[in-house]
Amino acid sequence: MSGQSLGSAPIFCAHLLRRVDEKLVDLLGSLEPSEWDLQTLAPLWKVRDVAAHLLDTVLRKLSMVRDSCYVEAVTIRSPQDVIALVNRLNAEGVTVYRRLSPPVLIDMMKAACQQSASFHESLDPFAPATFAVSWAGEETSSNWFDTARELTERWHHQQQIRLATNRPGIMTPDLYHPVLDCFARGLPHVYRDVDAPVGTVLLLEISGECGGQWFLSRESTRWNFLGRSAREFACRVTIPQELAWRVFTKGIDRDSARAQIAIEGNRDLGERVLHLTAIVG
C-alpha cells in the first residue's frame, strides 16, 4: 500500500493504456469458446458482451474525440440526459459487436487499442478534454483526468472478464493503483452535500499492495483532499483492494459491501463512501 496521501496530484497514466489493452488482447485470445458465454458481474452482460462493449467504446472515442466525427445531434440538459445517452449508446454498441466471432473481434480490438494508446499518449495532459469526468462533478476536465478515467474503464471491464473466467493478472500495483487513485477523485463530489464542522477529516484507506490513503477535509464550502494529516480523523474507512473496484463500479450492492468494509469513528460519515460510483450509467 502506498504510504503517501493521495488525491491532489495529476495522474499521468497514458502509457498504461497500451499495457492494459495488450493484456486484454492476450486474455481474449486465451479464452475457450465456452468461456465467451460465461456470466460476468454485470447482470445483463456475459463475457462476449463485455468484450463487445470494450471494442465499441474504444472505436467510439477514436471516432468522436480524435476524428471529430459526430453523426448524431443530441441535447444534454441534465445529468440524467447524460446517463440515458450513455446507456443507449452502450446497449446499441453491444448489440452490434457481440455478433462478431472471437477472431474478428480480437483483430479489431488489437488495431483499435493500438490507435487509442497512441492517441492518448499524444495529448497535452493539461489541455481541456473533450468530455468532462461527470461522476467527479466536473464540467471541464483536463486530458490527464479523462485519460485516467479511460484507464479505469479499460481496467475494470477487463477485470470483470478475468473474474468470470478465473484468469487473474492485472491487480498489480503498477496497473491497479492508478485506477484506485482515479476512482477516489470522485470523493469530494460524493460528499458535497454532507455537512460537518470545518476541519473534519475523513480517511479512506484501501488495504493491500495496490492501495493507498486518501485524506478528505471539510473546508468552509466544500470537501477537499489534503496531504497526510496530523489532525485526528473523524472517520476511517478501510476497504480491501479486492473489493474496492467492485464498490466503485456497481459490481456489488451496498449492503453486501457494507458487511466487508471496516469503519472506525463516525459511521454515518464513513458509509457515504459507498455512494461513490465512478462510472456513468
Predicted regions and their residues:
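Short, helix-capping/interhelical loops that line the mouth of catalytic, cofactor-
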Residues: 1-12, 60-115
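An N-terminal domain-cap segment
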Residues: 2-49, 63
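Acidic interhelical loop/turn segments
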Residues: 29-40, 114-146
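Short, contiguous alpha-helical
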Residues: 37-81, 133-192
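Acidic/histidine-rich alpha-helical segments that form the ligand environment
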Residues: 84-127, 144-150, 200-202, 233-235
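A glycine-rich beta-turn/hairpin centered on an aromatic-Pro dipeptide
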Residues: 176-218
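Acidic/His-leaning functional-site neighborhoods
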Residues: 207-236
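C-terminal interaction segments
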Residues: 229-281
